[in-house]
């Protein structure tokens, strides 16, 4: 190092943004700060973690600065603990001298997380620090360490003992640390530290605990700590640092420690001693165990050739067989040359294990579906020759990069495959990958507004001014430039200005750590030798401390184990069919099923993989897919950008426009997509056919076109035109084709991925078209807790003529089941009952037979699992109807029933079963004397338990009255709107109302309603909402006036008016005929039910009773009655009432 003694200084304690919500300097900025300050080195010092070690090393090296890799390790078992209530475990500063030291530091950081899962924070016992001390320099910890507080408290003996122990373990690699941030406790501790150091000939070292880069960042950093701790900036008792905790220049540090210049000199000495940096590595894979003495390349070739023989057996070939063998030899040659046989074998192995154990595996994902070797190894299930898929899109010999298979597994059994991989390669060699959430524009604005205690309404308005576009996030600075109201608020309100200024400084800093949804790494050695490890409390697996980018730089190879819900749906549907005696292999379905394509053309694709959004369903109606290739094209086209070409595709398909294949030689490439360039593979093939590119070169061209770098594009155009000229294509024509292809290449889709997902789309569509009952049961089981989605499926099932039966404790399963061509509603889908509790219920029933009555039920279940709330909601949902009709009585008696259940359970636990001898009724409590709910109340209670109307609808008895007011139901409105009708009177019960602000600030609303034929949504613009808001309350029955707009099979409703349903029918009904069954109660009892409904205006009521011989007798009651839903419900549930009829 060139710095002269007495002048230089090196910061050894820099907290990066990886000290989450504490450090405010990004890892790539530390080296730049040091270089600007003319410091030869800088030390990373994040608390407990090494998240940024490799990243910092790389960027510091680029800045010409020596990275020092350190970590502030929280320790227990030495010195004193925290003295302030918000303080955490004390830390010791450890710095890596060499590779051995770095590996030990990695081990200690890993221990902090992996061994502290049950503790409030990561900590390391001092004994572990001592065990892993080789190659590490120890600083005594400063203000946050285990010694300073003891000296400050006058506990000199304890402090001295702790320092002596550190010195014993680390010897000449131990430094006593001094800090001067102006804190009283530092001044109180310093004499003891200096005296001990001089007495024991241990060097002093000066450090500044750096949290932020410049003095002006202090206020923003203070807010950051408040975000971390859930505190407020204006709060007195809270954690804070001082304005001195910044990256001070060397001269300031020298001035601060002018009385102890050696303490600054020793920062340079330590920097010299720490001549190690974390290096990037080439990819490292575990060795794959092979058979018969073969190496990995030979094993791959052996498995691939045997696999192709098996694939070709019984296959309808899409090309001559020699083409398959030729392609196999080509791919194997590239895989061997690039050194990836082991990768293919590892992936194939865990997929084969999954399939052998009955775990559903997807047919492929991403560009890997273009590999024939992947197909013959059963990594994928798509014949790439059949679908025209390219290997070079996956693995390009012209551009060396790791292959990357993304594998979809059944989401319920994915963990089993991961466990297999752990057992095969070693639990210490398999880990997930960490990810970091950051403070993005809206979130940081909301957080800063909260800690600065701005009014919640104001903060909410500010946040809504920031555009929300997850696909292309807008920064806060961009939002202020783009949104005049935000700029105006900043100008007019000092508090808003201060909030925005702080938020702008904090935006982009890391907020939290989590784990990658699917990525795993597998090492050839214990992973702590390659990366430190982290433990997410929500996962059983450890995770790497380096994120996706840097874990690959560390040499680890990522394997993606994704959980795909649709695979679980498919598996469950197949199992339902197997119970009926139908064995089906979805992987062998023919691609020419007429019912499937009829379903797709109808757009009735709720629940069909990739094809269920409203926009996609509209496009299906236009496109009328007739092949798997067209489904593949649709999946590729239905995205921003390519979507503009859907109309051209459809018009060319149906002959409304001519197909333009650009050049005769390209007809085979573009014929499948009617002249529209849809796929990246088409771009590659055009370059190959027209301009003589190899497919490897064509993949590089595709990438260049996607990046749109002008210099590179200019060179590629010269190459393209030149190559085309050699094939006798005029320069003008080839140049225009190049420009057209370049335009499409920017948003061309990966055909391999689209084809693989089209395969799953076809399978789900086939099931829905051919076995809809099993499809709905399986689909609904995978959305047990999503009542909105269950309501959609229920409505869709009705369209398919499928009955969804109410839950029943004696018939239903915990999941949705199939019985006699109907779907049985799942007990586990009832709100607030608990899936595990319902599995217990089903197990009890399976062991002891059906429940005889509600007492038998509570006497057999475990009340610790099926609690009072579960009993109440089972009753509300009608699950006890088969053994106890009175739902209201069970709800009213829930306390009694659960107490009886607890008593019986205690008896069983005490070995006193059968206490009441042969009389099962003995000792049973009395149920509350409660009448059952009327029909309206019953449906409302059912709604509360199920989330939607399942067995009936509050308005179904009013349909006749409503029709007299020319009110139509949803099903009729849809049909009439598609036929051209535009204005309707409709009705419904309001499910929810979501209000939003327009650009002008006025409120409009999306109102969800349900009528007896289904659920629908109406958009109420501001002027309509203003006059109808009070009527459109959730739970209210309303009659509405709407305008309808129909396009491509989709109907949208726009609200003009709304009124209570009672008002809509008050002058409509002439009367009501009440048909009585032979078992009818006394007429007087029915009259009493009518008394509350007597009114000046209303309809007449007539009782009708059969008297034999096909004759009836009528009794018209005097007076008039309000014939609303409440009265109808009361009559409908009265004993002996058979039918209500409007007249």
From Swiss-Prot:
Catalytic reactions of this protein: DNA(n) + a 2'-deoxyribonucleoside 5'-triphosphate = DNA(n+1) + diphosphate
Cellular localisation: Cytoplasm
Entry EC no(s): 2.7.7.7
TM regions (residue ranges): none
GO terms assigned for molecular function: 3'-5' exonuclease activity; DNA-directed DNA polymerase activity; nucleic acid binding
Pfam families in UniProt: DNA_pol3_alpha (PF07733), DNA_pol3_finger (PF17657), HHH_6 (PF14579), PHP (PF02811), tRNA_anti-codon (PF01336)
Keyword tags: Cytoplasm, DNA replication, DNA-directed DNA polymerase, Nucleotidyltransferase, Transferase
Gene Ontology terms: biological process: DNA replication
A GO cellular-component term linked to this record: cytoplasm
Presence of keyword Translocase: no
EC class: transferase
InterPro entries, sorted: DNA_pol3_alpha_NTPase_dom (IPR011708), DNA_pol3_alpha_thumb_dom (IPR041931), DNA_pol3_finger (IPR040982), DnaE2/DnaE/PolC (IPR004805), DNAPol_HHH (IPR029460), NA-bd_OB_tRNA (IPR004365), PHP_dom (IPR004013), Pol/His_phosphatase_N (IPR003141)
Function: DNA polymerase III is a complex, multichain enzyme responsible for most of the replicative synthesis in bacteria. This DNA polymerase also exhibits 3' to 5' exonuclease activity. The alpha chain is the DNA polymerase.
Subunit-structure text: DNA polymerase III contains a core (composed of alpha, epsilon and theta chains) that associates with a tau subunit. This core dimerizes to form the PolIII' complex. PolIII' associates with the gamma complex (composed of gamma, delta, delta', psi and chi chains) and with the beta chain to form the complete DNA polymerase III complex.
Family in the record: Belongs to the DNA polymerase type-C family. DnaE subfamily.
Name of the protein described by the UniProt record: DNA polymerase III subunit alpha
Species in which this protein is naturally found: Caulobacter vibrioides (strain NA1000 / CB15N) (Caulobacter crescentus)
